[in-house]
From Swiss-Prot:
This is Retron Ec73 reverse transcriptase. GO terms for biological process: defense response to virus. Belongs to the bacterial reverse transcriptase family. Part of pro-retronphage phiR73, which is homologous to bacteriophage P4. With the help of P2 bacteriophage, is excised and packaged into an infectious virion. Retronphage phiR73 can lysogenize a new host strain, reintegrating its genome into the selC gene of the host chromosome and enabling the newly formed lysogens to produce msDNA-Ec73. The C-terminal domain (residue 247-316) is required to recognize RNA. The gene is ret.
Length: 316
């Protein structure tokens, strides 16, 4: 049985569906969106037929491939909160923030292929279908120049798998630096290294630069976003969340102000209808990230919060 027949049977599609999509896949839709700090980002959206095969690959192939414990984005039961919490619980005072430039597009199919050869035994049918499977992944999950596109549902899993080598080597090298005792996490392209060693930023950056030269993917540091921060007497922002001087996690001030403003407008009966769902999401977000802040909000805006939550439940 060819791999295409396997996909047809397991997705309950008609015979020949997968091979037909493979022969002439419908090109993805694409559009450009502006980045916050200038430039454009291209987003790709696969056709429904291609997406069906992508989900089959996610369930039967990519979900079985390992990723490093330091990876926190696109991982079940992990979030921006658990990422920030790990650094907060380490009680480290000094933070180095490193952004990987063009993270998804810097990953090529050859990078995936190289990593896949190390772990192919985890997939039950790879021995029989190796070449077919790799060709399918190249055609269905990568775009014409063999780069990993932003927007495909398969891209996050592939990216975490390919970046495993980076995470592994960086963790080993950082652990080998005497007295550094660093905590390392990666949330997609956003890397945080925290430590209690003052003045360690050069050591950490040199470690990164050496490691980048040793691995397959062409990852590059975005120097414009490189930051060194200290929690002494203040707070640090980790993946959008605030790590306070007493090491508890809370929302950024701007988000708190936005929630208060929306609740105030609701209490006065002038919150726009289209903002009701936004407020419901903000409240759920606040409750998850900082229950203490949510409790304070609830004391002041109990009726408003109850009303917006009931409205959300009716919609569901």
């Amino acid at each position: 049985m060819r791999i295409y027949s396997l996909i047809d049977s397991q997705t309950l599609m008609t015979k020949g569906f997968a091979s037909e999509v493979m022969r002439s896949p419908e090109p993805p839709k694409k559009w450009d969106i502006a980045k916050k700090k200038g430039g454009m980002r291209t987003i790709y959206h696969p056709s429904s037929k291609v997406k069906l095969i992508q989900y089959w690959l996610m369930n039967n192939v990519f979900s079985k491939l390992p990723m490093h414990n330091a990876a926190y984005a696109f991982v079940k039961n992990r979030s921006i909160k658990s990422n920030a919490l790990l650094h907060a619980e380490s009680k480290n005072k000094y933070y180095v923030k490193i952004d990987l430039k063009d993270f998804f597009p810097s990953i090529k199919f050859t990078d995936f292929e190289y990593a896949f050869t190390r772990y192919r035994d985890r997939i039950e049918f790879t021995t029989e279908y190796d070449k077919e499977l790799l060709q399918l992944i190249k055609t269905i999950c990568f775009i014409s120049d063999s780069t990993l596109p932003i927007g495909f549902p398969t891209s996050p899993l592939i990216a975490n798998f390919v970046a495993r080598e980076l995470d592994e080597k960086l963790t080993q090298k950082l652990n080998a630096i005497d007295k550094l005792n660093a905590t390392y996490t990666r949330y997609a392209d956003d890397i945080i290294v925290s430590t209690n060693m003052k003045g360690a930023s050069k050591l950490i950056l040199d470690c990164f630069k050496r490691t980048m030269k040793e691995i397959g993917p062409d990852f590059k540091i975005n120097i414009k976003k490189f930051k060194i921060c200290s929690a002494s007497g203040g707070s640090i922002v980790v993946t959008g969340l605030k790590v306070c001087h007493d090491f508890h996690i809370t929302l950024h001030r701007s988000m708190k102000d936005k929630i208060r403003l929306h609740l105030s407008l609701l209490s006065k009966g002038i919150l726009k209808d289209e903002d009701h769902n936004k407020l419901s999401g903000y409240i759920a977000y606040a409750k998850d990230i900082d229950p203490h802040f949510y409790t304070k909000l609830n004391r002041k805006y109990f009726q408003e919060i109850k009303w917006i939550q009931n409205l959300h439940n009716k919609v569901e």
